[in-house]
């Protein structure tokens, strides 16, 4: 009979990363917060869906705040102190996510809006009639 082999999972090493970049992608349906180091390697991430919200509640400002707090907590464990914030998208959770990062203890050095704007590219979706 074959002996059971012991599987060792990948160990996450605790790195000391003092500063980095927080990418906040805020759509109408969800908010995703990724915190990376200066080389671009993601240290921590969270989203409204990963924070336990489902359906239409993922697009709320409170869900964005919860996601940003969770990502900031993980980044602080890795030793991050200063971040630049790059915001993308038209969602309602943009400002609350930035405020949540600040309240969590991260010092924000720069806020930049990097929402992609088409130079008359694809046709827009039709208007909703409610």
Swiss-Prot record:
One of its GO terms (cellular component) is ribonucleoprotein complex. One of its GO terms (molecular function) is structural constituent of ribosome. It comes from the Bacteria. One of its GO terms (biological process) is translation. Keywords: Ribonucleoprotein, Ribosomal protein, RNA-binding, rRNA-binding. InterPro entries: Ribosomal_uS11, Ribosomal_uS11_bac-type, Ribosomal_uS11_CS, Ribosomal_uS11_sf. It holds the Pfam family Ribosomal_S11. The keyword Methyltransferase does not apply. The keyword rRNA-binding applies. Located on the platform of the 30S subunit, it bridges several disparate RNA helices of the 16S rRNA. Forms part of the Shine-Dalgarno cleft in the 70S ribosome. Belongs to the universal ribosomal protein uS11 family. Part of the 30S ribosomal subunit. Interacts with proteins S7 and S18. Binds to IF-3. This is Small ribosomal subunit protein uS11.
């Amino acid at each position: 009979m074959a002996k059971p082999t012991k599987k060792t999972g990948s160990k996450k090493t605790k790195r000391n990363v003092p500063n980095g970049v927080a990418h906040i992608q805020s759509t109408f349906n969800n908010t995703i917060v990724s915190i990376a180091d200066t080389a671009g390697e993601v240290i921590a991430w969270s989203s409204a869906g990963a924070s336990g919200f489902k359906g239409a509640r993922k697009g709320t400002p409170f869900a964005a705040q919860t996601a940003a707090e969770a990502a900031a907590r993980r980044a602080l464990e890795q030793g991050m102190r200063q971040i630049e914030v790059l915001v993308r998208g038209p969602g309602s959770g943009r400002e609350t996510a930035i405020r949540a990062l600040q309240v969590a203890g991260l010092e924000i050095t720069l806020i930049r809006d990097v929402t992609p704007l088409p130079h008359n590219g694809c046709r827009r979706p039709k208007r909703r009639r409610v």
